[in-house]
Amino acid sequence: MSITAERKAEVIKTSATKAGDTGSPEVQVAILSERITNLTAHFKTHTKDNHSRRGLLKLVSTRRSLLDYIKKKDEARYKALLEKHNIRR
């Protein structure tokens, strides 16, 4: 359900705006999207896992807040993120 350190480093590397960038909203959205994808696959086999489902909803809410922040700051970055991570809006 959690992502491995290697996968997280790979996601950070592909989403970073500059070297050493781990905290920008784009990187945070990328990491959250990866975790959400993993949890979604988990729920295909464990349909009654409501405890983890609550965690998924919290991750989605956090990602939504970050996306709203990016949209408020720069619409082009927002649209690029939606396209890159296949996020519905």
Swiss-Prot record:
Q: Name one GO biological process term.
A: translation
What InterPro entries does the record point to?
Answer: Ribosomal_uS15, Ribosomal_uS15_bac-type, uS15_NS1_RNA-bd_sf
Naming one, the record's GO cellular component terms include:
cytosolic small ribosomal subunit
Q: Where is the composition biased (Basic and acidic residues)?
A: 1-11
Lineage: superkingdom: Bacteria
The keyword Kinase appears for this protein: no
Similarity-based family:
Belongs to the universal ribosomal protein uS15 family.
Instruction: Explain the purpose of this protein.
Output: One of the primary rRNA binding proteins, it binds directly to 16S rRNA where it helps nucleate assembly of the platform of the 30S subunit by binding and bridging several RNA helices of the 16S rRNA.
Q: How does it assemble?
A: Part of the 30S ribosomal subunit. Forms a bridge to the 50S subunit in the 70S ribosome, contacting the 23S rRNA.
Question: Which named protein is this?
Answer: Small ribosomal subunit protein uS15
Q: Which organism is it from?
A: Rhodopseudomonas palustris (strain ATCC BAA-98 / CGA009)
Q: Which gene encodes it?
A: rpsO
